[in-house]
Amino acid sequence: MSDMMTCMPFGQLMDWVLQEKKGQDTVFGVHRPYTADPKNDMTIFTRNLETPVGPAAGPHTQLAQNIIASYYAGARFFELKTVQKMDGAELSACVNKPCILADDEGYNCEWSTELTVPDAMGEYIKAWFILHVIAKEFGLGAQDGFQFNISVGYDLAGIKGDKVNTFIDGMMEAKDTVIFQECRKWLLDNADKFQNFTREDIEAIPSNVCNSATISTLHGCPPQEIESIANYLLTEKHLNTFVKCNPTLLGYDFARKTMDEMGYDYMVFGDFHFRDDLQYEDAVPMLTRLMKLSEGLGLEFGVKITNTFPVDVTRNELPSEEMYMSGKALFPLSISLAAKLSAEFAGKLRISYSGGADYYNIDKIVGCGIWPVTMATTLLKTGGYQRFTQVADKVEGICPKKWERIDVDALKKLAADAITDGHHVKNIKPVPNRKSTKEVPLLDCFYAPCSEGCPIHQDIPQYVALTGEGKYKEALEVILEKNALPFITGTLCAHNCMTKCTRNFYEESVNIRGTKLTAAEHGYEQLIGEIKAGEPNGKKVAVIGGGPAGIAAAYFLAREGAAVTIFEKEEKAGGVIRYVIPGFRIGDDAIDKDISFIQKMGVEIRTNTEITSVADLKAQGYDAVILAIGAGKPGTLKLEKGETVNALKFLRDFKANDGKLNIGKNVVVIGGGNTAMDTARAAKRTEGVEHVYLVYRRTKRYMPAAEDELLEVLEEGVEFKELLSPVSLDGGRLLCKKMKLGQMDASGRAGVTETADVVEVPADTVIVAVGEKIDTDFYTANQIAVDERGKAKVNDKTLETSVSGVYVAGDGARGAATIVEGIRDAQLAVKDILGKEITRDAAVTGDVKDCFEKKGILKHSKEAKTEEERCLTCNKVCENCVDVCPNRANISIKVPGMAMNQVIHVDYMCNECGNCKSFCPYASAPYKDKFTLFANEKDMADSKNDGFVVLDKENKTCKVRFVGQITDCKADDPADKLYDGLKKLICAVIDDYGYLITK
């Protein structure tokens, strides 16, 4: 496929807007319009402005449809994508693709517009007309309630050249341009298509599109050049002017220190740009002169803060050597520069702001007197343009009618607070891979990432919704269908579902684990009386081990009518959860409630009973035996000198003795997993202990433990000793070799190398939490084949061992695993024993419209009454790729005969920025992998995408590429061999979405 975009004719754009609004009540995929209240209007550059927010010069202001979508959602100030003398194919060839990565902080390697400069002007003027139309036609606001601001660069010679100069003049006065006349004529010729927009309104559309400019210069541009451009725009063009400043004005030391403190120490940047860019001591007098000049001319002048921040590509983020950082990591730098300049000029220097602005800081920025504010990175995330609606709502009434000055003290506080603000600080752990291992299908690609990420594929959106509605019993029924341990998993689950949750791209995951526990706690008494075993099926099964996997196996067996006996060597069932996991993490009551489900179904639990022979059980008439014996062989770490304590033994002793152990004042825990975190927290609570040190050979960022576990350990005062490798214990001191982080491996984890430096850590006791192993003696004693690592050889789909009718589940199958993985193992074994499916999916209910009401709305758990308010119900609607595409090149369409909307990719609108790949939950890139509509056969030939080009709309003849084969197709012919679902999709495009087809 080509990364060259094709501009749509004005008539096609206008038809698209009107027909989509009429048919779907959306505009370019934006569902909820923002309607401006005139009482909140303000004035800038002598013109009216309804909201002080809009899209920054970048991907969201390149094409007309981007600007229209922004306006519909609530934007009113449009900083148009930069134009310069290099443009079109020449510029596009210099931009490596994909060029955007925005799954956390943002990065890009793009420049100015990839259109030709004349085409860019055409897009802006088409958008100018359409905004005037929809403001009146759809009742969104005043026709003069928005403003366009041109962004020009990169040097004075280029700006004075015919290409850019013609652009500037055309945007200042467009009445004689061909595109202005075309747009005006189309509206007059089609005036009967409008209900509210009149011929008089058409005649009144002003031709002076903009009266302001933002100067964008390349890094290293001399101050004299910047000032000469500003002088030219002010004196020759009489444009209100902003000069874009770079974060490099803060100096290298400030930027490096700030990024390191905030967790962005992995960002690599040198001091070159800080030395080469505009220097602060040059900037202040230059800005002083320009302020005086503009005042004398009766124009407004200010700075645009800030440009993006150049960093090196070191982890294959983008196909470039250098990229530009934006978003949450840029905010503390940009707002600090704003504070510095504002203090310098006593609040009299006007600032147009961009640099990590989003819903959570927009009111504070505007409240300081900084506006307009433009955005990019937040719009690149799920919710997309719809995020503007919440942003516009939040700033209503904050701005004065006319700008006065900046509140310097408030701005200083905002800058100081940004350094520790959780919305901008980097998480301790690296951003996890949130993608599935599956490739996106051409049709029906919606699915819930949480359910997919759960080893037992729980129906999470369904029980979250039921819990939110207060239907706790029904929610617990949904949970118990697939999860036998709602109390235990509601407390301790490793919650991969939450890692995969799309809500992470908004602010934080839906609290799925907590919701499960809420449903269990509130639904238990209503449901426990109804729990009973299934009709007897004649099967008799023994389960060895009463831990999570064993309890789960017994639950599913008994529910389906099998007679089940659990053999547990301890005094009570519960396994590691009861005897090892500390009581401050889970109480016995929660464990007992989960066990009560199997007790209600008549499962026999024989405690204090250790089984050594599987053959003996079979001789007693058991049809099958499930081994859920755990992985209890201690992991070891041999020191050159001194003894260590195994973590599981310590935790067992801690729990058995209520923390009354003699382990000294200084305790070292070696390890970085969840068991190490439990051990450190328990040691902190042990009688007589004063200091607990957690020693790990890498840094916190690379510890296997979950982030929430790490945070709890930090909050409780455990001292982290990073980059240390233990050597020996002698005289109350643990000697460690200092380690050094090396290159990243393919998984993104840093390697480590040993240095000659030695570090001492006070240590009366050293506890080792470095992984438990499977005790293979039981397997070999029972003639069960094991592999070279001592694990039982099993059928991966059934977990049956080499001994017929004997299965392995839980930690004893694969080594230390999660609780929910143990439940999955139990399901696999039970399914094979019974020869049938044992779980059923919950029904998907509710109105799809409710899903779209939540899109684009940022809301933390603490801000919501229930998690149902935040759950995006991805099992009904995903459309992440539709949300995040700046160009609207991924389209959701209704196909007759299909339950859910389908997504197609529109080739001629795409520039291969790659943003949709980051947010698609599949291991795919929608711009490459979704069924694609091409404008013509040439475009199709230039692409490898499966897709189609419409040859004749009337006869529905197309050329189609499917699984790489190109054929001619008549979409409405039942005899045509093309897959029926794709024929339906093509027919829907032709019949109901004809505006997508270019003429």
How would you name each of these model-derived features?
Residues 76-86, 247, 364-391:
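Glycine-rich phosphate-binding active-site loops on the catalytic face of alpha/beta enzymes
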Residues 519-535, 593-613, 634-687, 787-797, ...:
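Glycine-rich dinucleotide-binding loop and its adjacent helix/turn
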Residues 22-38, 248-347, 382-400, 641-642:
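Glycine/Thr-rich beta-alpha phosphate-binding loop at enzyme active sites
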